[in-house]
Amino acid sequence: MTSRDRRGFLQVTGGAAAAGLLGAGRAGAADARARVVLVRRREVLGADGRVNGPVIHQMLNEAVAALLGEKDAAPAWRRVVKPSDVVGVKSNVWTPLPTPPALEQAIREELERAGVRPENVAVDDRGVRSSPVFQRMTALVNVRPMRTHAWSGLGTCLKNVIMFTDNPPDYHGDSCATLGAIWQKPPVAGKVRLNVLVMLTPQFHSVGPHSFAKELTWPYYGLLVGLQPVPVDATGARILQAKRRQHFGADRPISPSPHHIEIAGSRYGLGPSDPAQIDLVRLGLAEDALV
């Protein structure tokens, strides 16, 4: 890790949390490496800001193929799921910045193309606990947009599974530091096959719960895709912190600290957050990548 990367990560996650990362990791996280794919296409957003369905579908397939080292998407998806799987697609319906329906549809189509029966695929967010498909699921695809968040610092792939819990506020303490624990409990444990962090128009700053301002988003045109949540979220955090530095003209750490990302890796073994341990594969648009 370069001195700038190290300094940037400390500013993103908060000094105390990052200090634990930069020393010996726990739960095997320190020795692990992870691949994350960043794919960006300017044409994914129209002049009106609408998502181009065929383009985002292409981006998803490019990312999944690159993630698994396949030349084509079809064999890659067949490694993500098998025909006998029952697959829940955990989306996010927060009104100002939801998971794009075109991306949800692309995921569904690829799961079915890989052999999963249509009746064994469901897309949901707040209704996952009552969904018959999610109650039977053997595999989970986790997809949500990246944004700043009043309780956890950042809305992340890690946080996206909180709706599987009996009482989400139980995990709000210490800036949602224990979100990683959810991933070790039923029905999530061992079932997440793919994490997709939507970086089309991320929100890089907010004040207060449920705060949204379009002027605090920007067209980044990207998706981050990985097998483990921590390296995906850590990469997204670096991008948002770089945007904040660019926007504010100074290093202004995300607040509250999104240290749940580092803790999920070091305490719960959900992948590395150190950029030096993340193999970032870049596809498409390179301009203003910020990472």
Where are these regions (language model features)?
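N-terminal and secondary-structure boundary signal
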Residues: 1-291
